[in-house]
Regions:
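Short, low-complexity N-terminal intrinsically disordered segments enriched in polar/charged residues
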Residues: 1-35, 144-148
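A beta-strand edge to alpha-helix "cap/lid" segment located at domain peripheries
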Residues: 2-9, 70-148
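Hydrophobic pocket/interface hotspot
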Residues: 14, 29-30, 37, 61, ...
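Hydrophobic alpha-helical core bundles mediating ligand binding, dimerization, or RNAP-core interactions
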Residues: 14, 18-21, 33, 65, ...
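Short, flexible active-site loop motifs that bind/organize anionic cofactors or intermediates
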Residues: 16-19, 55, 75, 126
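Short, mixed-charge, low-aromatic patches
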Residues: 20-29, 51-54, 71-73, 95
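A solvent-exposed, acidic/Ser-Thr-rich amphipathic alpha-helical stretch
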Residues: 35-89
Length: 148
């Protein structure tokens, strides 16, 4: 008899994904993705996507998502902390605090929500950032959005 995945299983998977991110183990993260994973895909492009923010561009499939991690690899991580992980059915939300310095001199610090959606087999089928995209756009343009 097959067992179905639970919200707890999916939340544990996301905790493992963030642990892999902390180790720089991109392969372990990509292993958790469905072949057709929709990464930052929305019904309409977001303002950040229209502005060309490289880490918020829409991507499809693990090979394309690897490009997201290549972009992050060019950034300096100043702070990254998972504050909470909350699950409901096929979806898990992670509350994170993130601060990065970008190659062009821009910086951003933000508290974000990351929405992860799963299939029945426990693979991630969709990922979306919910963040202050104005900060991300400004940082991509070389601005330091951490200065008040």
């Amino acid at each position: 008899m097959a067992t179905s995945r639970t919200t707890t299983d999916n939340a544990a998977t996301i905790a493992d994904v963030y642990a892999a991110f902390g180790r720089g183990d991109v392969a372990a993260i990509l292993d958790r993705l469905a072949p057709d994973v929709a990464w930052e895909e929305w019904d309409e492009p977001t303002f950040a996507q229209l502005a060309g923010v490289p880490h918020l561009l829409a991507r499809t499939g693990p090979a394309d998502v690897a490009g997201f991690f290549a972009v992050l690899g060019s950034y300096t991580v100043l702070d990254f902390a998972v504050l909470d992980i909350i699950g409901s059915g096929r979806q898990v939300v992670a509350e994170v605090r993130a601060s990065f310095a970008l190659p062009g001199g821009g910086r951003f610090a933000d508290e974000e929500l990351h929405l992860w959606t799963f299939d029945d087999g426990g693979r991630v089928t969709r990922f979306r950032h919910y963040s202050d995209t104005a900060k991300h756009i400004a940082a991509t343009r070389g601005e330091d959005t951490t200065v008040r």
